[in-house]
Amino acid sequence: MMMNKIKNIYKVGIVVFLIMCFASCVKDTTNTTYLGPDLVEFANPNYIAPINPTAKTVATTTTPKNDSMYIQLVGPQRSTGTSVTFVVDAASTAVAGTDYSLSTPSPVEIAPNTSGIKIRVVLNKVTAQKKLIINLTGGDKVTPSANFKTFTFTLNP
């Protein structure tokens, strides 16, 4: 009698196991591939605190600070380079040559078979808070993302 109960429990266990195996093999029909137009956008890959991908606050010192912002391609990688242009916004209060200098001039080129490029900037000591605002203006068959086309450095003394 006890042996029959053990056999029945064993059989039920095997059936449950087989059902779980077949149920877990259901094909995922969710498509997560981006199908929209090719865009470029600023991305600030800050893995410690990824709060704001398009802004950064920097405390300046007497020694110039090297920093960067990242432009990424949204869409498939291309077999040829992708030219991207950017400009310093007229609303910037930081002065070129005094408060900052762009080590990477516009336009930049996203290399073939890659998804982005860094724009390097040198930030100098400021005596009052200043803002450096960079806008993406487009490029080689790409348009700037509406939400991530502006990057702002806030320079603090």
Regions found by a protein language model. Give the residues of each.
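Bacterial N-terminal signal peptides that target proteins for export
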Residues: M2-I14
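C-terminal motif of bacterial Sec signal peptides marking the signal peptidase cleavage site
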Residues: M20-S24
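Short boundary segments that mark the start of a structured unit
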Residues: V26-P157
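Enrichment for repetitive, rod-forming helical segments
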Residues: V12-I14, L18, Y34, N156
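Residue-level detector of intrinsically disordered terminal segments
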Residues: M1-M2, I19
